[in-house]
Amino acid sequence: SKLTNKIFCFPGNAGTSQLATNVEVNILNFKKILRLIKFFKIDLVIVGPEEPLVYGIVDYLKKNKIKVFGPNKYASKLEGSKAFMKMICAQNNIPTAKFKVCNQSKQVKKFLNICNLPIVVKADGLASGKGVSICRTKKQVIKKTSEIFNGKFKSSKKVVLEEFLTGEEASYF
């Protein structure tokens, strides 16, 4: 925009450096980010990465009187927790694949006795795009869920098992 004379990206990357000034900072260090926003006299913050959103950066900046665009911590749970998203869909009659949220192996095994394969296994929480597996055998489901329960994706030890749907994928967020 011609109304903007300077853009900063925290932390930025090689691509953003063509358009903006990259500032190396831990995106979860909200206090340091606030100091940098004030130092550079930034008028508006647009939050992109999921992790700071899930941890509440929008709430933190608003509390500190910073103009910010992005979902608050509660709304960010739609992206940050697959289990939360599925529960919201179920409670509001939003069409979604049939699912079961599990936090222990015996729940998984019980679900395997009543469902059809393949099954989609999703780590609840942020997993850098690596927390979803399409499992075609019960053995694969047990292996993937065990990895999650054992902390593979540190963000959660909960899994969402859901029926496999064919077709185009669509995201809510």
Q: Where on the chain are the PLM-derived regions?
A:
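ATP-binding N-terminal substructure of ATP-dependent carboxylate-amine bond-forming enzymes
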Residues: 1-74
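Short acidic-hydrophobic, aromatic-tinged amphipathic segments that line or gate anion-handling sites
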Residues: 22-29, 100-104, 135
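Short, hinge-like loop/turn segments at secondary-structure boundaries
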Residues: 23-27, 62-65, 86-88, 115-116, ...
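CheY-like receiver
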Residues: 36, 40, 110-111, 144
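Conserved ATP-binding module of the ATP-grasp superfamily
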Residues: 44, 95-98, 118-120, 135-171
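Short, well-ordered alpha-helical microsegments
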Residues: 53-55, 108, 169-170
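A conserved helix-loop-beta module that forms one wall/lid of the active-site cleft
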Residues: 69-131
